[in-house]
Amino acid sequence: MKRFLRVTGWIVLGVIVALAVVVGVRFGIAQAAVDRFDRTPPARLDAIGAVEHLTILPLFEKATSSADLAMGHGVGYLVQTDAGTILVDTGFNPENLDPSPIEQNMVTLGVTLDDIDTIFVTHHHPDHTGGITWWQQGTFSLGTTQVDLAGKQILTPIALTYPGAKPEAAGAPRVLAPGIVALGAIPFVDVFPLSLVRPQMIEQVLAVNVADVGVILISGCGHPGLERMVNTAEQVLGQPVAGIVGGLHYGEGVTPAVNAGIALLEEHDVALVALSPHDTGPAGRNAFATTFGAAYHPIAVGEPIVVR
């Protein structure tokens, strides 16, 4: 019996060591991809143009402007410009409600699919792709049924599928319309426990160049980090970032990362800061709000952020 227990113990230990080695190697590969990106930034785009008007209407978030609107952990922003309308992320539906929270809010706010030209999925996490079921299936959805998106441009961070449509995975930066740019595939090491499934992940960021304002970044979670996103935007667009809207994944508390982000945006003298409550807690958001004053805008479902 003792011999059996010893053998079993060694086998279990061997399995644990082997798994640790595999996980370590995969994390190392993921970090190497991030390091390569930092060493070889993407090429600059020429003549990106500008939009005259930009309004960002949150359709799903962890805060709401009215009891008539649903809220939850996740993101869904309607980016409205004179060059086109883009839905950034498709929210989260953990209770499998039909209609989903984001679909309910679209009805309440008078938004239809006909209003949307492009679907822009920032990264492949359940709270940005409509729920765990769709995430597991390598796709995304607005609700419990995948609605017809034929004829719409669909931009995804990695190769995803969608019935009746052909999503385009992020690659090099590209101009989507005059003044609207997808900054391309920005790698990051995924967060635990999702990192156990796929350590290396991609997030894409939307950049909108607004006349007389400058470049506004629209972020889903900000996993690559604010500094990397700002540096990428300025390398690609050749002009300074003037604002940031969306997730920055600072978590709870006023951390060193929060202070570094504030300092970076102060250096840029930004015109707009709006942090998502789904991945930055009240203390961090309050620190940004206190620093930037009138330039800071809370994010809540149904509360439009009018840039120009």
Stretches found by the model and what they are:
Residues G84, L142-L155, H268-V273, A294:
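A short helix->loop->beta-strand "cap" motif at the edges of active sites that frequently abuts
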